[in-house]
Design a protein with these regions (language model features):
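A domain-level signal for the structural core that forms small-molecule/cofactor-binding pockets
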Residues: 2-209
């Protein structure tokens, strides 16, 4: 027997009477990225390709998927008060907090002419950085030190912290995170010299044993 009632799971019925579904918001975003030839690897920022309201829709979809994951882990989320709202919490955590560097624009950073013609090396740090291993999605926690030999332009010291937080708030391996952070700093202030040191604990090693 063929059902005439559209089945909706994470999709939205389009209301045209034929029971077909609109594609999930993640599928629409992926299609847009592919059409633009844009990379969407784990540590890429895709904010330029998100339309207004889509991040909220994506958060709802992610919560649905996390709910499915918990059920597949045989966790009774309907009767366990500790996990009843876990899916919503995890979705918000990923999109708005720990992976915000993928979905949100870079913090605004103003640069200024180096009118004093400073050319001495200075350092900023330790800066607390938090990320996640892109292999297992478990935390990477540590500190970052940035050494700069100024060029024609300079930025405020607090801006290094904001940019580092934005870059590290994505799934990463540490080596790539350092390269991305260096590229962003070079674009912002074009230093004569730049050095970055990261000292971090990787919980894919500590937690998993």
């Amino acid at each position: 027997m063929t059902s005439t009632v559209p089945f909706v799971s994470n999709g939205v019925a389009n209301g045209n009477g034929n029971g077909s579904l609109n594609p999930q918001i993640s599928a629409r975003i992926r299609e847009r990225l592919r059409e633009a030839g844009a990379s969407f690897l784990a540590n890429d920022n895709i904010a330029d390709h998100l339309q207004p309201g889509e991040l909220d829709q994506l958060q709802v979809e992610v919560a649905d998927k996390v709910r499915d994951l918990l059920r597949s882990l045989v966790i009774d989320i309907d009767n366990d008060h500790n996990t009843h709202e876990t899916a919503e919490r995890v979705a918000k955590m990923y999109l708005q907090e720990v992976f915000k560097g993928r979905y949100h624009q870079q913090p605004k950073v103003a640069s200024f002419p180096n009118v004093k013609q400073l050319d001495e090396i200075y350092t900023v740090g330790p800066i607390t950085v938090r990320s996640a291993c892109s292999h297992h999605l478990v935390p990477i926690m540590g500190n970052c030190w940035i050494g700069i030999k100024p060029g024609a332009r300079v930025i405020g010291l607090s801006k290094f912290t904001r940019v580092a937080d934005w870059v590290f708030s994505r799934p990463h391996i540490q080596e790539e995170a350092v390269m991305i952070l260096a590229d962003e700093i070079e674009k912002l202030c074009e230093p004569q010299g730049l050095g970055i040191i990261i000292k971090a604990q990787h919980y894919c090693m500590k937690w998993r044993g």
